[in-house]
Amino acid sequence: MYISRNMEQWTKFIETLRIAFNDGKEQDLLTLLLTPDERDAIGLRLQIVAQLLDKKIPQREIQQNLNTSAATITRGSNMLKLMSPDFMEWVKKHTNETENT
């Protein structure tokens, strides 16, 4: 799993995010903390992960479909290798659910 360079800050961010979701303030918090480009990058990363997990499309085709760099696809692919299979199944299930809504 990815280890943040500053675990205390990362843990505080995660806890603040958890509270925001519990209070229905997640949109406001993420808008406050992330620039439009950063929000777009997160959305792109989610699409990359979903397509990589689907395993129906080669990485080069994902790159072309999403109009992104090979390095961006590779970073997503490398992170998949670090995560547990159970978690990746959870991600696959939930990315499929959000695509179908």
UniProtKB/Swiss-Prot annotation:
SUPFAM superfamilies: TrpR-like (SSF48295). It holds the Pfam family Trp_repressor. GO terms for cellular component: cytoplasm. Coiled coil: none annotated. GO terms for biological process: negative regulation of DNA-templated transcription. Keywords: Cytoplasm, DNA-binding, Repressor, Transcription, Transcription regulation. It comes from the Bacteria. It is found in: Cytoplasm. The keyword Transcription regulation applies. InterPro entries: Trp_repress, Trp_repress_bac, Trp_repressor/repl_initiator, TrpR-like_sf. Residues 59-82 bind DNA. GO terms for molecular function: DNA-binding transcription factor activity; sequence-specific DNA binding. Its main location: cytoplasm. HAMAP family: Trp_repressor (MF_00475). Belongs to the TrpR family. Homodimer. This protein is an aporepressor. When complexed with L-tryptophan it binds the operator region of the trp operon and prevents the initiation of transcription. PANTHER family: TRP OPERON REPRESSOR. This is Trp operon repressor homolog. It comes from Mannheimia succiniciproducens (strain KCTC 0769BP / MBEL55E). The lineage of its organism: Bacteria, Pseudomonadati, Pseudomonadota, Gammaproteobacteria, Pasteurellales.
